[in-house]
Amino acid sequence: MANNVNLLYGLPQRVITLPANLIQSKSKIFIGNGDPNCIIGNNCDMYIDKNSNRIFYKCGCNWLLTGTIMGDNGFIGLRGSKGDTGNKGEIGDNGENGDIGQIGDNGSIGSKGIKGMNGFNGSKGIKGDKGTDGIKGDKGQDNFGSKGQKGETGSKGDDGIKGITGSKGFKGDPGTKGENGINGTKGLKGSQGDLGTKGDDGIKGIIGSKGIKGDPGNKGEDGIKGTNGLKGSKGETGSKGDDGTKGITGLKGTKGNSGSKGDDGDKGIQGLKGEFGTKGNVGDKGDTGINGEKGSDGDKGNKGLDGIKGDLGDDGIKGDKGIKGLKGDTGNSDKGDKGSKGDSNFSKGGIGDKGSKGDNGSKGESGDKGIFGLKGSKGDIGDKGEKGDLGDTGLKGSKGLKGSKGDKGLVNVKGENGFVGDLGSKGSKGDKGESGDKGDIGIKGDKGAKGVTGDKGDKGTKGFIGNVGFKGDTGDKGIIGDNGSKGIKGSSNNKGDKGDKGNTGDKGITNTKGIKGDKGIKGSKGDLGSVGEKGEKGTKGDIGTKGETGLKGIIGDKGELGSKGIKGLSESFIESFYQEIPGTFVSTVPDGAVFGYLSAAGGGGGGGGIELSSLAGGGGGGSGCFYLLPLTVYPGSQFTGTIGQGGSGSTISAVLATKGSDTVINYGTLTFIAHGGFPGSSTLELGGNGDTVTYPLPVTPAPGGTGGNMTNGSNGSTSIFMFSGAGGGASGLNSGFNGGNVGPYVGGTSSPQIAGGGGGASAFGNGGRGGNTTQAATKGEYGSGGGGGSEFSPSGSTNGGDGGDGFVRIDYFMVPR
């Protein structure tokens, strides 16, 4: 069965002085290969199978399997503390906003809409046949009137709720700008007739003052952004739309004398056509005017569907043939001020039908530069004048017709739809979605679940090795050796009664007189005689255990011959937690701790009183107790719970005795309960029963002792790391009965009189004494039962003694070095 069975002594333990100096049986730990044989070991011994790391506990003649050593897994559980970080995962809820970010992608399409403002170059109007240059006449009174004031830009209309973008429709006739607000009314623009042959230049009129540019209208508030509609598929290129409706023909101006044509200014708003001036003499051929610069092509916008072809404009009225004037002096070719660029938002009138070529007027002399009359809307092409000198070829300013690029403005209207696209930038909210990534951190919190794995570490009943702690009790004898140090004090008795002054001798430690105390060491001879007992008288000195000054008495450690349990104490013991005040408690596992040894008691049962004359009450029962129960612990974790209070003794007949309350210890998912003892009876002379414990071990705890019934209470029992409480003794007329015992602790005594029963003992204290005719019942201690009350107690007191309060003690150890 078990081979190479070795007795193990060197395990790290501490000699623990428990509240009442409990001396436990000398448990042993055996280590071998395979299951233990029933012939080895005694009750409460432990056996560890090296092959399987299983732990057995001997109970009676049987070895009970209690668990396995799994300490290593327990260390993995330490990581569970990181689980706290998981709380941040809640921030991840914001990540849902990321979906809105996709709408932002549509917004980028809207930016292309801005390019739409430039649009495709409007289809250039069909250039009319170049008319024969007429004879340059006197510059007519083609007064370029002051530029009409630019209509104020209408306030931008509130953007309507953006509807779902429909499929792109065909380009319709340019209409007034819709949702972007009503444009200010523009002066009537004459429809542009087809370019005819250039008539004689009239006298250059004085350049009219530049019209005041209207103030831009207030921008309307943006409307509520509608959801972006589905982008329509790009339509097929439609057939070229008809020219737009012909604009209203401006009033025909009088023909002015042809002057030298000045450089074409930028095309301004077309004014009223001036009247033809009298034909002047044909002037000298003017220098060929500088061709106007070709306007730069606008950025190519997304090609929109071609609009429906506008109706062909009516043919312009053929202009009257101008009289050929004398060639005027060459007019100043000063380039006119650049006219304000026409508002591109307005619909361009369709190009009128090509007018008949006007007759060339006779070239008259260049007249004085006339005042620039208001530029009338381009009138009907006059009759083709006589062919003038080639030089009369006007500046290609007619190319100013390229101002038709203003049609791009029409495309702009389309482009403004692109502005709606800007709202798509709202998709930036999608960036918030990135903060949603923080939610991933929340996933880290799952690691906290590993902390549960740490509970597996609790299985690491490796601490069971702590049974050697029982052995440590032997070390308690070493504590008795401390009494031996008192014997050293007894050595000072060699000096006689002055030994009491030995307290002042402590002062002598500061003085050289303390050296005389060294002579006291010779008093070790006192070990031989009962002089040491006199040292017990020195217990008075205990009052001033200053005798501890005789720490030199540590020499008495020699009495610790069996102090093998002390080995490793200084190396592995960290600290102890102890509380005996009833109520809640919290103990935090210190740094470095790996093992904890739990000792605890519940509240003892209260002693019974009397109800009828000549009767006394039974003693209360003792509580269940834990003793050095080993646990695997983790630094920073906590033991919490409640310490039980002793039950109240009975008071006369009005209030019966009560049961002691339980002591509850919680650690992680584990719960340990030391149940309180039962109260003594006040009516039937019965003692209260002792109680037991509840713990998460695969064994049944020993039952509590039974209260006496005209007998002494029965003793408590023991099981793995626990003791049950003893029963209280019964009361009697001629003599009461004693409470039961637990280990070295005895039940409360009674007396051969009408007396209450003695309280049952606990594993840590004696039971309370029963009351009689000369003494009152006493309280129990450390979970033992209170004594029963008696009718004939002094002053007529009949109260039973209270049960002893419980306590909790936890000793923490590190890994042995």
From Swiss-Prot:
Main localization, broad class: virion
Collagen-like domain span: 83-142, 145-264, 268-327, 352-411, 430-489, 512-570
Keywords attached to this entry: Collagen, Glycoprotein, Hydroxylation, Repeat, Virion
InterPro entries: Collagen (IPR008160), Collagen_Structural_Proteins (IPR050938), Gly_rich_dom (IPR049304)
Glycosylation site list: N106, N121, N183, N345, N360, N483, N709, N712, N715, N772
Biased amino acid composition, Basic and acidic residues: 126-141, 149-161, 212-224, 233-245, 294-341, 354-368, 377-390, 428-458, 495-504, 515-525, 533-543
Any one annotated GO CC term: virion component
Domain of life: Viruses
Function: May participate in the formation of a layer of cross-linked glycosylated fibrils at the viral surface thus giving it a hairy-like appearance.
Name of this chain's protein: Collagen-like protein 4
Species per Swiss-Prot/TrEMBL record: Acanthamoeba polyphaga mimivirus
Source organism phylogeny: Viruses, Varidnaviria, Bamfordvirae, Nucleocytoviricota, Megaviricetes
